[in-house]
Amino acid sequence: VSTRPDCIHESYLEVLREAQGKYGTNITVELGLQSVNPHTLLKIGRCHTVAEFIDAALQIGRYHFDLCAHIIADLPWDDRIDVEEAAKLVSVLPVTEIKIHSLYIIKGTKLAKMYEKGDIKLLPPEEYAERVVLILSMLRPDIVVQRIVGRASANTLSVNGGRPWWEVKEYIEKLMRNRHIQQGSACNYLHGAAVRRFLHE
């Protein structure tokens, strides 16, 4: 079930639980976080807040459904600190899966008009790859990574800097190999990190 964070309500989750019991199937809820920067969320017209994502994730966690979070790694208004915080936020919540993708500029949208006028400066694929590597390094190791680069439909003006999706994917994997980075290799901020550092001194 793919939906928005501000559309999660206990009554809907009860329906899903009943369906799960009736049909004996696993249920995954997909939520778009996209960014932890409130100014960016306004820019792209998400009309939900980070707090609403947290609330929705906690509600879903109470029902023990799988939860897949979506993050856009190359939003022009986000910096690497925002991207790192997105990975951390996902990791402290009951998120079981993640999809990472780049910004799609769809024809006929407000973003498309801004792009065509030159009001948006998109990040190059190399920066997208750097941000994905950062996310993966900060991500909790047990979260299933379903996607690290997306493919777009024909009505898309721009995605992945015009590069083929597989080329971007291979570049990300190359960066991780060359730098000896694995998922969760920098996930050292959970479970009282400051106390652990003090105890180990």
Residue ranges and their predicted role:
Residues 51-110, 126-151:
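Conserved C-terminal portion of the radical SAM core fold
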Residues 97, 104-201:
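Auxiliary Fe-S-binding modules of radical SAM enzymes
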Residues 30, 72, 116:
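Short glycine/serine/threonine-biased micro-segments
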Residues 10-12, 40, 80, 109, ...:
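Generic domain-boundary/flexible-linker signal
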Residues 4-8, 76, 150-155:
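Short, internal active-site loops enriched in acidic
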Residues 1-50, 54-56, 61-62:
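Conserved SAM/AdoMet-binding glycine-rich loop
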Residues 43-46, 79-81, 159:
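Short, solvent-exposed loop/turn segments at secondary-structure boundaries
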Residues 39-46, 72-75, 119:
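Surface-exposed cleft-lining segments at the edges of enzyme active sites
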